[in-house]
Design a protein with these regions (language model features):
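Short amphipathic alpha-helical leader/targeting segments
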Residues: 18-19, 130, 145-149
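Conserved catalytic/binding loops enriched for acidic/polar residues
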Residues: 124
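Conserved glycine-rich phosphate/nucleotide-binding loop
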Residues: 136-179
Length: 179
């Protein structure tokens, strides 16, 4: 789920438009209903978190009418699960559940991403998805400098993120409003 850019752009867009973009960007490689629903729900979570919502409020913001794979996860089916009950197989529902579970069961960016990576299986996917939410919840300033220093194209990524969030002529204050 390569959704952070969509959610960053989405802080200034109507949530319905942002979710359409989230679904469409998924269609380029993953067009199954579960993939589209996961992208919609996660984009809404990320958008809310970027705008300042805490974890529970961001999750609540993603509530909606989803199918049998994604609906239970957004409703909280992962709550109370132990680590050995969380799969990181690469299937979209497993990846979404694992990412949400990792952030819910930690209190900082490092621990969330490391927990995701240490689940094994499709660890890079799970950690990347987790990192998007952990970064949105805990803030970019909480990411280890040593990790950021190794990031390829870091300067370009940061510039593009600023452009997505604050396009020319649209600078100003933003805050979570429950949408």
């Amino acid at each position: 789920m390569r959704l952070a850019p969509v959610a960053i752009w989405g802080i200034r867009a109507d949530p319905a438009v942002m979710t359409r973009v989230a679904r469409r960007q998924s269609m380029t490689t993953h067009a199954a209903d579960a993939c589209l629903e996961a992208c919609e729900a996660y984009a809404l979570m990320l958008r809310a978190a970027i705008l300042g919502a805490d974890f529970d409020s961001a999750l609540e913001n993603a509530r909606g009418s989803y199918g049998p794979h994604i609906g239970p996860i957004v409703a909280g089916s992962w709550r109370g699960k132990a680590r050995d009950q969380i799969s990181s197989s690469g299937f979209v529902a497993h990846s979404l559940e694992a990412a949400i579970w990792c952030v819910a069961n930690t209190d900082n960016f490092d621990d969330a991403v490391l927990l995701a990576a240490n689940l094994g299986d499709d660890a890079d996917t799970t950690a990347a998805i987790t990192g998007q939410l952990a970064g949105a919840i805990y803030g970019a300033s909480t990411i280890r400098a040593s990790w950021l220093e190794k990031l390829a194209w870091r300067d370009e990524i940061e510039v593009l993120a600023r452009i997505l969030a604050f396009p020319a002529g649209r600078l100003g204050s933003i805050a979570y409003s429950g949408n």
